[in-house]
């Protein structure tokens, strides 16, 4: 059985884009993250160690948005996905 964790509307200013003004002025980015996982162990134990920490996922995503600039949004999204996929249980 697979369950889903969805974080929506994570907001931060980033300096991503192909154009100079995007890197210079920055812009607001809104990130949604969907993770497929299995909640059964966490449901039985009521222990954060048995699930994915939503706050950690949000911090990872926002760190990418506010971090070094990417030209393409696709590259930013791939970096966020790569970070999330390193978490146990994903």
Which residue stretches match the model-derived regions?
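N-terminal, polar/charged subdomain of small-to-medium soluble alpha/beta proteins
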Residues: 1-90
């Amino acid at each position: 059985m697979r369950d889903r964790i969805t974080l929506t509307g994570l907001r931060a200013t980033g300096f991503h884009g192909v154009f100079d003004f995007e890197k210079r002025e920055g812009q607001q980015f809104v990130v949604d993250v969907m993770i497929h996982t299995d909640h059964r162990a966490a449901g039985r134990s009521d222990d954060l160690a048995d699930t994915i920490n939503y706050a950690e996922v949000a911090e990872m995503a926002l760190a990418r948005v506010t971090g070094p600039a990417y030209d393409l949004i696709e590259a930013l999204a791939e970096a966020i996905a790569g970070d999330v996929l390193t978490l146990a249980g994903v």
